[in-house]
Amino acid sequence: MKIGIVTTWFERGAAYVSRQFMDILAKNHEVYIYVRGGEEYAKGNPKWDLPNVYWSNGLHTTYINKKEFYKWIKANSIETILFNEQQYFTPLVWCKEWGIKTIAYVDYYTEQTIPLFGIYDSIVCNTQRHCSAFDEFDDIHYLPWGTDIDLYKPKYTDGRLVEEGKVIFFNSAGMNPLRKGTDTFIKALYKCKELNSIRAIIHTQVELKQFFPELSSVVAELESLGILEVVERTISAPGLYYRADVYVYPSILDGIGLTVPEAISSGLACITSDNPPMNEFVHDDFGSLIPVTRLYARKDGYYWPQCRCDIDALANLLKKYASNSAKVVEMKKKARKYAIDKLSFEKNASSLSDIIENTK
């Protein structure tokens, strides 16, 4: 079967999801990528600019030009299209007219747009939370999310600390440090600045000062004390997990919380928000959940509320982990074992090909 995937396509979470779908489906089918708009384009990047990739003249939205889209479908004899995080629904009407089967990978939706997903022939959800929002639909499929456990793997197989005598914490801020709770992490870390054994790394694809100008002096002080290192650039997978022992992710809102399974697979203990979908992945034997102090709506009307984590509770967890390195070592080993048992994307998504083939 010839399958198309409509997606953003560069170094970011949504594109990694599409790439993993492509790799799984390519074992039995011909897969073609239609790159719609997004924050960036990776055209010219040998990792992303592949022979099966078509770069549309898209905008920074999920808008699609009808003539251009139809030309791509015809040129590749596309039979079925998987849409990743599609918010512009008109192309679904076109696909109905053209006899193309459509499958939604669910991530973004509001109370008003959920009924619109009925136009799809099939719906794929990667978290229990997403499934619960679409439980009235007939052709819905739950594929537990996972990751590439061979790519994301520990630096040391015995769970030892990256740097002897120091527990190193890590936060991946990506393109949106506010949504990833990076400010909460910084504030909690500042409450731990008297601890000699604590170190932290923040990886961000944008400048922190753009998002948190009010925290500039705090970040500068933590850097001057040798507690915090901020890495501001795009880094390809498997990222910087190998440099840390504990992943800290006080996210305020996520579709999957993609970096959490990546961190677990990399053999990191995990501290994250006690809110779905993050708390679907983290268990007591290799991590901790941060109490949520507030739930509040997002201004664009996204279906699920945002959350705010308790900064003092997070600070106490950082202190607890930093002062108990032996426990952290055991948690790291258990994290990797859990990933091998439960988080293999190749295993978890093995039924995706069947779902697509059986979509009517």
Residue ranges and their predicted role:
Residues 6, 160-180, 186-190, 201:
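Conserved donor-binding/catalytic core segment of Leloir-type glycosyltransferases
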Residues 114-115, 146-165:
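Acidic anion/phosphate-binding donor-loop and adjacent secondary structure
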Residues 117, 234, 239-244:
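Short alpha-helical donor nucleotide-sugar binding micro-motif in glycosyltransferases
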Residues 121-154:
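Donor nucleotide-sugar binding/catalytic pocket of nucleotide-sugar-dependent glycosyltransferases
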Residues 212-235:
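Nucleotide-activated donor-binding/catalytic signature segment of Leloir-type glycosyltransferases, i.e.
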Residues 252:
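Aromatic "clamp/platform" in nucleotide-sugar-dependent glycosyltransferases that forms part
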Residues 269-272, 279-282, 288-289:
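Short hydrophobic beta-strand element within catalytic cores of glycosyltransferases
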Residues 308-309, 313, 323-356:
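A charged, aromatic-enriched C-terminal amphipathic alpha-helix characteristic of glycosyltransferases
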